[in-house]
Amino acid sequence: MSGSKSPKGEFAGRKLLLKRKATRWQHYKYVNRELGLKVKADPLGGAPMGRGIVVEKVGLEAKQPNSAIRKCVKVQLIKNGRVVTAFAPGNHAINFIDEHDEVVIEGIGGPSGQAKGDIPGVRYKVLMVGKNSIRELVRGRQEKVKR
C-alpha cells in the first residue's frame, strides 16, 4: 500500500492534533471566524441595529428583469461615521424621511448578510424615523413629529 501523509499509529495523537491545527488556517471560513473579520467589516459592528443621520435620498434602479426605481437613503452612522445605503420599505415611505432626520436601520435579511432581491448593493432597511416606526407612518397610524 502506498503511504499516506497522515501519521498512523498508537502514539500519533499529538502529531495529528498539531497537523490539524496548522491546516485549519488554509480554510477561509476558519480564518474569518478566528480573526473576527465579519464583525470588523460590518458597518454596524456586529450589532443588530444602528442609528444614523440621513445624508441624502437616492433612487436606485432595480436589477434585470425588473424595472423600477427603489427608494433608498444614504445614512451616516453615529457610532463610527460610516455611510451606508438603506432601503425605505413601504408605499411612499420615502416621503416620511427628510434629510438630517435620525433613523434606525437594520439588516435587510438577504443571504449571508448580503443584498436582497433586485436592489443592488443595499444591505440595510430603515426601521424607524425619529421615534416613529416607518411601517406605522406608512399605514397612517402615527404622524411624524414636527420640530
UniProtKB/Swiss-Prot annotation:
Q: Which UniProt keywords apply?
A: Ribonucleoprotein, Ribosomal protein, RNA-binding, rRNA-binding
- Give GO terms for biological process: translation
Pfam families linked to this entry: Ribosom_S12_S23
Single GO MF descriptor? rRNA binding
Q: Which terms in the GO cellular component ontology are assigned?
A: small ribosomal subunit
Signal peptide residue numbers: none
Enumerate the InterPro entries for this protein. NA-bd_OB-fold (IPR012340), Ribosomal_uS12 (IPR006032), Ribosomal_uS12_arc (IPR022863), Ribosomal_uS12_euk/arc (IPR005680)
Q: In this entry, which stretches build a coiled coil?
A: none
Q: Which family does it belong to?
A: Belongs to the universal ribosomal protein uS12 family.
Record NCBIfam families: PRK04211.1 (NF003254), uS12_E_A (TIGR00982)
Note the subunit structure.
Part of the 30S ribosomal subunit.
- Primary role: With S4 and S5 plays an important role in translational accuracy. Located at the interface of the 30S and 50S subunits.
Identification of the protein by name: Small ribosomal subunit protein uS12
Species name: Methanococcus vannielii (strain ATCC 35089 / DSM 1224 / JCM 13029 / OCM 148 / SB)
User: From which lineage does this chain's organism come?
Assistant: Archaea, Methanobacteriati, Methanobacteriota, Methanomada group, Methanococci
Give the gene name.
Answer: rps12
